[in-house]
Amino acid sequence: MHEVEGKLPKEQWYNLARFLYFDKEDYDSALDVLNTLIIYYPKKQYWVQASHLYGEKKDETRQLALMEAAYEQGFLDRSSELVTMAYLYLNAEAPYYAGSVIQKGLDDELVEEKSKNFELAGSAWAQAREVEKSIPMMEKAAAKSDEGELYVRLGNVYLDGDQFAKAAESVQKGLKRGGVKRPDQARLVLGMSYFNLGEYNKARRAFRDAGKDERSEKYSKQWIRYITSEEQRQIELQKDIF
């Protein structure tokens, strides 16, 4: 659509062109129209739809850029929009921004308080190495879930935060509840938690159980050898003392 004698075509004319391009599945031309609408009539619907079309074209850089612009203008007020933006940040390897967006959405009661969204916030903070922010989100995610997987993931976060007793308790709860994708990995976390608590016998049992799965057999054996060497080291230290 062309501007004539410096006059701006009416918004509905652009929308008619947009509709016709969509009807023909000419999405490149539809994007051109949407980008023009964004310049002259910067409404939420145009920002969001253009972002969606860039997503369809696998251009996540422009998709995220438009979502960011819409977010900064306060246009994104739906749970699905904020969740989408958080995932885009994660895909762009920007977990801190993902955590910030979803956390604010939850705090402002714009994002639905369901397990999956708390998990998204917790995972984003964990990836950003913000363990203290991740823990309460993962706690809420696990509490709202019927399966044990999220309790195991919570155990991982507790372990990262040096909360070893809570890590062991959470992993045990997850294994008991069931639905854990990799029980062997969960038992490795359990073993590491017990090791850091100085409960070597429990740690050894956990690693042996983990090693029953060939995918964790190597790490299990390494940990068991390490426990044995640590026990021997402590015995030698006691000898030196007395």
Model-derived segments and their meaning:
Residues 1-197, 202-234, 240-242:
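Alpha-solenoid helical repeat scaffolds
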